[in-house]
Amino acid sequence: VVLDPRETPPSHPKRVYRQLVQSLRYPDIRRRGEPGLKPLFQRAVADEEVCERFDVRRGKGDRDERLAEGMHLYLSPALSYFRELDADDAAERVGDIDGPVDGYLEEAEQLLFDWIEGHPTISNTDLNDKLSNIQGAYPWLYSLMDFRPWARIYGYLLSGLSTLAKACGYSGLAVFVDEAERFSLLSSENRDFARYVFKALSYAAVGNQGVPFPRSQLADLGGWGVQKELPPRYGDDPGLYAVYAMTPHEEGIDTLYDCVPAGKISDLRPFDDRDFAELASKVCDFYASAHPDWEMSEKTVTRVTSLVEDVRNKGHVRSPREAMKFIVELLDVARHYPDRIGEVVRGIEHLTVY
């Protein structure tokens, strides 16, 4: 997720969470677009052990007892409903409604994912009413508000998703937060809330023993009733991996040291020739895997690496980002216009020193 003071301000945990879900990528799914949580949910409800682990079933039962036994306050009810909506005989599980059943099922599923993925949607009360046409009793769907103090609740939700991913056979969930230095563009009040978001994500990833602050700092943040009692982390080993990328900035660095163990903060050194050569090789490898119908020769990789060194020496490429852009554009020409690549390469070779 790329933090932005307007679209994805780090002071608003729901917006950060929503962007994370929208940016979600699965190692075994290569289709374009934003798959969201549906592929993970489909995998979960198809596995009885996962359903048992998350207490996915009909019936409300005693909420506190179910939470103690492993139920996730948000994911377990969502999975319980989705299992009914995704079933082959889903139409037979719908009570009397006005209008076509297929339309109801499609709308109900969309509303369910809008809610659990953090999109603007109807209230959780209206959503519970909407889903009440599905036969059986289900746990209550609680609110997911766009309130700044809710960092702990979204940390609980993210660690739950990571635990679910592990249960489904993945290694967990990796969260990459880019442009973290934009935190400094916020008002002083919003910077305080952004610190809670960073702390909640760090706590959800490594737990009480791995963070430089006490759990009590997250205890009273957001929610009502049972939401107030939710821990900042679901499970003992959720497999959540969090990375913050920040251009050095005095206040931002101080904030990182408040949220992340000092031993986990690394200063990246500038790229040297060997690093740029490795970057060229890796970008070529990723490009080839993304376009399996196009054959990339070892000669092409060697030539691209040489051209990157050439344009760097002439001052036309200065950063890893510029190098990646140059490599991808060069490979695009080679793939789409193979008859013109020679002309392009000759033009690059004749560039003057910048």
Regions found by a protein language model. Give the residues of each.
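P-loop NTPase nucleotide-binding core
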Residues: 1-168, 313-316, 320, 326-329, ...
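A short, terminal or domain-edge coil/loop segment
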Residues: 55-65, 234, 295-299, 350-354
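Trafficking entry modules
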Residues: 114, 342-354
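The catalytic "switch" region of P-loop NTPases
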Residues: 114-303
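Short amphipathic alpha-helical patches
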Residues: 203-204, 222, 307-308, 347-351
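AAA+ P-loop ATPase catalytic core
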Residues: 279-287, 300, 304-308, 319-334
